[in-house]
C-alpha cells in the first residue's frame, strides 16, 4: 500500500500526516503554537522556526504510532517547501529531506498553496477543473485549477490578505489570537448594519481585491469611538517600531506592556455591545466584497474553460472555516449554477494531510524533487514548476 508522509511548517503550526493511496487519512497531527505567539498578537517568525525544530520529532513519533506505521513503510516524503515564513519552511524541508536520504525514499517539494488548492480533491474527490478561492492569513486569490500543476491566477489581493485583516481587526478590538474565530463569534451577537465600512475596488470589474482600506476604516472608527486623536495614535505606532528593535529577550515584556496599554484603551471606551457590532459590520462587509468578487471570478473562469458539466467553486484556507462566509458565498454560487465546496474545519487551516495528498498526486505522476531543492519564501502557483 502506498503511504505518503506529509510535513507542514510554513507558519506557526507544526503538522505531520500520513495518507494512503485511497485518500484515507491515517493520522493528522497538528501542534499549535498559538500560546507562544498570543502575547505578541501575531506570529513571530524566529519563535515559530525554533518551535518547529523542537516539535517535528514529537509530531512524527505521534503520527507513526497513531497510524500504526513504520518508517520503512513510507513510500515518499512530501513537505511544504514554500511559500511561507522561510525559517519554518527550511526547518520542515530539511527534516523531510533528511528522512528521504536516510530511508532512500522519494522527496516531493510541495507548494503550500497547492496543498490548499487540492484539499477538496482529498475530501470530496472533486474533478478538474474548478474555481478556487484561496483565503488565508497570508494569501487571498482566485485561481482556475485546470489540472495538477496547472493553475491560472484570475485575481488576488493588492495589499492585505483577508485572513490577515481578520486578525488585525481582532487585535484592534482586543480579541484573542488568532482573530478570525473570535470575530466570527462576536459577530453572532452584533448588528451587521450598525456601521457602514468601505468596500475597496468592489466595482473594479476584475478579480483583484483590497482590504487595507477596510482595515483602516475600522481603526478610524475605533479611534473616534474611543476619542483618541491621531497624534496619540501615531505616537503609539512610533513606540511600537522602537520596541521591535529591542533585544529578543526583552520582547515578551515589551509586548505584554503594549498589549496591556491597548487593553486599557479598549476596555475603557468600548463595551461588549459596541465590539460585537463592529465585528458583525466588519464581517458583513467582508462577505459583500467576496460575494461581488466571486461573480467577477466566475465570469473570468468561464472565459478560459469550457467544462460546464461540473461547476464547482472551492474555498480553501483558514478563512474557509468561517460559517457565515460559507453561507453567503454558497448562496452567491448557487445564483450562477455553481456548488460551493469547502473542506472540514480541521482541513481548512494549515495541516499536513493536504501536503501529503498533494504529494500523493505528484507521486502517482512520478513528479519527484531533487534533494538540492531550495526552499522559497515566495512561490506563485503559476510558477510551481520552476
Swiss-Prot record:
Residues reported to bind substrate: 134-138, 167, 180, 322
Catalysed reactions, semicolon-separated: L-threonylcarbamoyladenylate + adenosine(37) in tRNA = N(6)-L-threonylcarbamoyladenosine(37) in tRNA + AMP + H(+)
Record's subcellular location: Cytoplasm
Disulfide bonds: none
Example of a GO cellular component annotation carried by this entry: cytoplasm
Entry's cofactor comment: Binds 1 Fe(2+) ion per subunit.
Keyword Cytoplasm appears in the UniProt entry: yes
Primary localization class, coarse: cytoplasm
Protein name as annotated: tRNA N6-adenosine threonylcarbamoyltransferase
Native organism: Rickettsia akari (strain Hartford)
Gene behind this protein: tsaD
Amino acid at each position: 500500500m502506498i503511504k505518503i508522509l506529509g510535513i507542514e511548517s510554513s507558519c506557526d503550526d507544526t503538522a505531520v500526516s500520513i495518507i494512503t493511496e485511497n485518500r484515507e487519512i491515517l493520522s493528522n497531527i497538528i501542534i499549535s503554537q498559538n500560546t507562544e505567539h498570543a502575547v505578541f498578537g501575531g506570529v513571530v517568525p524566529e519563535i515559530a522556526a525554533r518551535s518547529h525544530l523542537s516539535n517535528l520529532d514529537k509530531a512524527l513519533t505521534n503520527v507513526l504510532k497513531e497510524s500504526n506505521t513504520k518508517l520503512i513503510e513510507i513510500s515518499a516524503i512530501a513537505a511544504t517547501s514554500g511559500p511561507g515564513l522561510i525559517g519554518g519552511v527550511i526547518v520542515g524541508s530539511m527534516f523531510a529531506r533528511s528522512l528521504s536520504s536516510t530511508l532512500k525514499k522519494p522527496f516531493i517539494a510541495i507548494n503550500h498553496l497547492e496543498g490548499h488548492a487540492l484539499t477538496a480533491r482529498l475530501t470530496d474527490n472533486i474533478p478538474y477543473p474548478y474555481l478556487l478561492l484561496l483565503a488565508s492569513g497570508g494569501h487571498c486569490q482566485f485561481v482556475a485549477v485546470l489540472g495538477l500543476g496547472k493553475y491560472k491566477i484570475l485575481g488576488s489581493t493588492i495589499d492585505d490578505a483577508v485572513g490577515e485583516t481578520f486578525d488585525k481587526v481582532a487585535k484592534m478590538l482586543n480579541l484573542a489570537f488568532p482573530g478570525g474565530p473570535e470575530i466570527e463569534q462576536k459577530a453572532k451577537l452584533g448588528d451587521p448594519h450598525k456601521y457602514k465600512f468601505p468596500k475597496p475596488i468592489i466595482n473594479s470589474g476584475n478579480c483583484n481585491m483590497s482590504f487595507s482600506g477596510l482595515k483602516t476604516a475600522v481603526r478610524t472608527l475605533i479611534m473616534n469611538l474611543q476619542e483618541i486623536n491621531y497624534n496619540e495614535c501615531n505616537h503609539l505606532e512610533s513606540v511600537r517600531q522602537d520596541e521591535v528593535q529591542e533585544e529578543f529577550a526583552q520582547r515578551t515584556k515589551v509586548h505584554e506592556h503594549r498589549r496591556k496599554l491597548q487593553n486599557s484603551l479598549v476596555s475603557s471606551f468600548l463595551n461588549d455591545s459596541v465590539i460585537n457590532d463592529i465585528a458583525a459590520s466588519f464581517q458583513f462587509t467582508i462577505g459583500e466584497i467576496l460575494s461581488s468578487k466571486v461573480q467577477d471570478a466566475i465570469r473570468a473562469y468561464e472565459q478560459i474553460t469550457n467544462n460546464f458539466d461540473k461547476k464547482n467553486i472551492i474555498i480553501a484556507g483558514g478563512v474557509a472555516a468561517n460559517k457565515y462566509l460559507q453561507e453567503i458565498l454558497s448562496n452567491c454560487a448557487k445564483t450562477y449554477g455553481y456548488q460551493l465546496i469547502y473542506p472540514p474545519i480541521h482541513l481548512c487551516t494549515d495541516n499536513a494531510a493536504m501536503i501529503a495528498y498533494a504529494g500523493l498526486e505528484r507521486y502517482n505522476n512520478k513528479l519527484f524533487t531533487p534533494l538540492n531543492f531550495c526552499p522559497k519564501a515566495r512561490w506563485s502557483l503559476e510558477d510551481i514548476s520552476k
